[in-house]
């Protein structure tokens, strides 16, 4: 048996995304015998010590750091994961790359196409392996759909349409925002409705249907300001300006010639349990039939986290077996297969997804059709 990969995580505190989604699959079987968490880093020494204490075991003492340089230079680590807010991606990931460590980085892997290209170039020049938190392709349902399309179950794809919604109250990109999430409402921070839900969807979309050819887009800011609220929903009294769109609509064509129509909606108040307000509905029409993907989960627009479970093919419901794994866990499993063997996103692939998003921004800003 090979030795487990020695892992450090930047941004792993006692709560938050890394502690609830990224790391848990690594702490139990089957992955716990292949990965070993040895170090954490946060900007606050106190929180770093608390996190290290939480993840230490009887056999392993997790080290606490509070700078990216210190954890990246730890000789006892093979790979370092960066799980911090988007504006801090480049600063932290660059330190890991410079130290010659393999890198996991959360999507969107930097602000805009320029920063993602920068990281991809640095990683390639250094010769390190990378894995990016674009996990939607790991979904058992999406893999099933990909197989159905490739096997010609619905014939040649003619068109595809998707609508998704993120309901209130206090969800991102709406009239109110939880304290600590204000950065999502500034477009230049690279964590918009298009960057996050959109980017993850395009990962599944292109994985199943192939590359996009042309795009025409509309992005609208319908809430010029947002009221900041506490975790319990009470207002803090602060109101911040918003330049991040709450509505993004995209039409265009695939390289195959199929027509696409996609619409992301946020800041909505219609209850998520109202059928007319289905959080995710994706239809793929072909010459021999259609595929319908649906989810009633309130946050189904975040396809990387909340896998759709309802699938119909030519009007018949198809059940997809639940293996009990998460998309994050499946991605970590793929990484173990080695360079070029595992089916997971890396920084070079992230550039391709970011190029789609960049084309949408350019189309929406200029009111023009953009070719990819």
State where each predicted segment sits.
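C-terminal helix-rich "cap/oligomerization" subdomain common to oxidoreductases
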Residues: 2-4, 32, 56, 79-81, ...
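Core-facing hydrophobic residues within beta-strands of well-ordered domains
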Residues: 35-37, 59, 77, 157, ...
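Residues that mark the start of a beta-strand
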Residues: 4-8, 156-159, 290
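Beta-strand-loop-alpha-helix segment that lines the small-molecule cofactor/substrate pocket
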Residues: 79, 85-138, 152
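Short acidic low-complexity segments
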Residues: 63-73
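N-terminal Rossmann-like dinucleotide-binding module
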Residues: 1-58
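Contiguous beta-strand/loop segments that form the cofactor/metal-binding neighborhood of enzyme cores
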Residues: 196-300, 332-341
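Predominantly a Rossmann-like dinucleotide-binding segment in NAD(P)-dependent oxidoreductases
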Residues: 16, 136-241, 367
